[in-house]
Amino acid sequence: MGQKPKVAFICVHNSCRSQIAEALGKYLASDIFESFSAGTETVPQINQDAVRLIKQLYGIDMAQTQYSKSLNELPPVDIVITMGCNVACPYLPCKHREDWGLDDPTGHGDDVFAETIQAIHRNILDLKGRIQNMI
């Protein structure tokens, strides 16, 4: 197999959903694809509830390994996944694009965050399977 496909997870601020997707993509599917995330805007730090829950659930410390990035910091990617930002994401050249339609859990309780994390987990595994079947 040649190079692994590069997947970019995109949302507005690159502080919560796309960061979770990048972390879980690396954790669950790094053998199949490379994970990146970015936003149309950036924030000084990623969502602290997301950091706390991903550390509790998966042992991943996103505060140490990830930061909010803008779209122009991405390498060329093969697949673009938007999180459901309800904004028109700028055009990023890619071979495949899809929207996961996930509501932002920011400002909600841990139960809403956990539901979002589980949805992203399922979507990452589904994407991994689809990419494996294409290779």
Q: For the regions a protein language model found, what residue spans apply to each?
A:
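Short polar/charged helix/loop
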Residues: 2-135
